[in-house]
Amino acid sequence: MAFVSFLLYVFVTAFTPGPNNIMAMLSANKYGFKRTMKFCLGVGTGFLVIMLLCSYFNLLLKNTIPKIEFSMTIFSSIYMLYLAIKIIFSKEKNKEKDDKKNYGFLTGMLLQFINPKVILYGITAISTFIIPFNNSNFSLIMYSLFLAFVGFAGTVCWSVFGSMFQIFLTRYRSKFNLVMALLLFYSAVSILLEK
């Protein structure tokens, strides 16, 4: 397994802006960390369910259509390159604040089922880095737990450091995006070179 590429992909994807992280940051800025923790726990729970579903979906595809592994690797690498380009050219979006909304556990959990970033994160990480090397039930469960934990940690970090990240991203947004994009680009290219 390309362990460095795996870790880079996992951490870059989990810690860059996405629906979970932005909602956690805004909620923590507005309601405080303690109230936002319910949302974060919901995100972690939903994340775990999605990672398990992605694991067994990928395993089913590999066992049903063994030749799909190479195609899944190519697709995953192209998706990672797409993400890198999207990160480089992303612009700050207007943040709509609704003073009456406090995102809870159920909101955080259900968000994962419609969050394309999490679903593609799971499919990409598992099909590229895990299934080709470890496909026992124990491995799939442990990697799903790891991926869910890192996703949960990313969301918690965005809520803990919400105001600091907001200032940082406002001031250094393009540099931050460039570094994250280059790390994703490195991961995608190293995967393709291993095949």
Where do the model's predicted regions map?
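Hydrophobic/aromatic residues within the transmembrane alpha-helices of Major Facilitator Superfamily
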Residues: 11, 15, 49, 85, ...
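Selective transmembrane alpha-helices of multi-pass membrane proteins
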Residues: 62-93, 148-154, 158, 166-195
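Hydrophobic alpha-helical transmembrane segments in multi-pass integral membrane proteins
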Residues: 51-55, 113-126, 183-195
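Residue-level signature of transmembrane alpha-helical cores of multipass secondary-active transporters
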Residues: 6-10, 43, 108-112, 144-151, ...
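Flexible cytoplasmic inter-helical loops of multi-pass small-molecule transporters
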Residues: 89-103
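Juxtamembrane transmembrane-helix termini in multi-pass membrane transport proteins
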Residues: 2-70, 124-143
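Alpha-helical transmembrane segments and their lipid-water interface positions
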Residues: 20, 46-58, 80-83, 119, ...
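Primarily residues marking transmembrane-helix entry/exit sites
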Residues: 2-3, 101-105, 118, 137-144, ...
